[in-house]
């Protein structure tokens, strides 16, 4: 596996690959089975796979966990090498955001970026969209792979690729879960034993909504109430939102098309997100020719 630490090294690596199909998996490190599932899917579909590890400061708010975010580079390297990753791009902050150019262009998606997580984390999705645009322009992959655990992020990036006619396929991979249903996340490391026991209520609430939907409950407010009730019964008091939205647009669900239930809640020291699409309609990948 090649180590690429700056833009020049990445561009030189990309030039050597010529017209091969390139799969790209952007991450912030602290890798777990969810990330490795993305890599394996890229490995199956593409001739070369590059992973990035970059804890992006512009997607963290002033009172969030940028400095505390777990960084496990040596363990991450070993996992990627064992999985057959071809190249790892692990730049410094200065390599991505040159200090001599403080007024960099920013990418924003006002409609999608200001709702749900964007409403409680102002600027978060602008930071995500900007860094992913830059990474896609540097890597120039055939396909980019994202987990659907962060459903709003996937929707934001899929919309961005469509709107800007970027020549890349955006592929969403289903959430990987622990045996008890908890969605895998790097922030699960923040959970102590009592919080870990509470956290499973997120997936339990989603399953409760799923079964109610299948049995004919198609009222968005009632479905959200079921989920919130499950969280509060587990002792989770700080809930940012429980929302039922259209699975394709993230607009409020009006009873047509597939609904997705989205949760953001604080459990112990961690802010956790999860979601579940209740209908049968799949979430398509996006390809721009």
From Swiss-Prot:
Keywords, comma-separated and alphabetical = ATP-binding, Cytoplasm, Ligase, Nucleotide-binding, Pantothenate biosynthesis
Pfam families the UniProt entry points to: Pantoate_ligase
**Catalytic site residues?**
35
Signal sequence, start to end? none
Q: Tell me which residues bind beta-alanine.
A: 59
User: Which Enzyme Commission number(s) are on file for it?
Assistant: 6.3.2.1
Q: In which pathway does it act?
A: Cofactor biosynthesis; (R)-pantothenate biosynthesis; (R)-pantothenate from (R)-pantoate and beta-alanine: step 1/1
> Where does it localize?
Cytoplasm
Sorted alphabetically, which Gene3D superfamilies does this protein's record hold? Answer: HUPs, Pantoate-beta-alanine ligase, C-terminal domain
Q: Name one GO cellular component term.
A: cytosol
Q: Name one GO molecular function term.
A: pantoate-beta-alanine ligase activity
GO biological process per UniProt: pantothenate biosynthetic process
Enzyme's top EC category? ligase
Which SUPFAM superfamilies has this protein been placed in?
Nucleotidylyl transferase
List positions binding (R)-pantoate: 59, 153
Reaction equations catalysed:
(R)-pantoate + beta-alanine + ATP = (R)-pantothenate + AMP + diphosphate + H(+)
Where does this protein hold ATP? 28-35, 147-150, 176, 184-187
User: What family does the entry list?
Assistant: Belongs to the pantothenate synthetase family.
Q: What else is known?
A: The reaction proceeds by a bi uni uni bi ping pong mechanism.
Subunit (UniProt): Homodimer.
The free-text function statement in the UniProt record for this protein reads: Catalyzes the condensation of pantoate with beta-alanine in an ATP-dependent reaction via a pantoyl-adenylate intermediate.
Q: What is this protein called?
A: Pantothenate synthetase
């Amino acid at each position: 596996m090649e180590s690429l630490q700056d833009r020049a090294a990445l561009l030189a690596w990309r030039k050597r690959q010529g017209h091969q199909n390139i799969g790209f998996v952007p991450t912030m490190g602290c890798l777990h089975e969810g990330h490795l599932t993305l890599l394996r899917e890229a490995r199956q579909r593409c001739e070369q796979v590059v992973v990035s590890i970059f804890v992006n400061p512009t997607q963290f708010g002033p009172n969030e966990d940028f400095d505390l975010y777990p960084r496990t580079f040596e363990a991450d390297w070993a996992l990627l090498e064992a999985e057959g990753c071809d190249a790892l791009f692990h730049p410094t902050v200065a390599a991505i955001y040159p200090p001599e150019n403080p007024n960099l262009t920013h990418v924003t998606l006002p409609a999608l970026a200001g709702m749900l997580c964007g409403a409680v984390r102002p600027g978060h999705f602008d930071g995500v969209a900007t860094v992913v645009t830059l990474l896609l322009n540097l890597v120039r992959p055939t396909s980019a792979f994202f987990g659907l655990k962060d459903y709003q992020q996937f929707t934001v990036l899929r919309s961005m690729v469509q709107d800007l006619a970027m020549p890349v396929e955006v592929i969403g991979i289903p959430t990987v879960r622990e045996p008890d249903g908890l969605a895998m996340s790097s922030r699960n490391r923040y959970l102590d034993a009592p919080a870990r026991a509470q956290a499973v209520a997120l997936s339990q609430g989603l399953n409760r909504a799923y079964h109610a939907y299948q049995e004919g409950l198609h009222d968005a407010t009632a479905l959200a109430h079921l989920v919130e009730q499950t969280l509060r019964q587990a002792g989770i008091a700080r809930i940012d939102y429980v929302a039922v939205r259209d699975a394709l647009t993230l607009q409020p669900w009006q009873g047509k098309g597939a609904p997705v239930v989205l949760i953001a809640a604080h459990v112990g020291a961690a802010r956790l997100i999860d979601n579940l699409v209740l209908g049968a309609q799949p979430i398509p990948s996006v390809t721009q020719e």
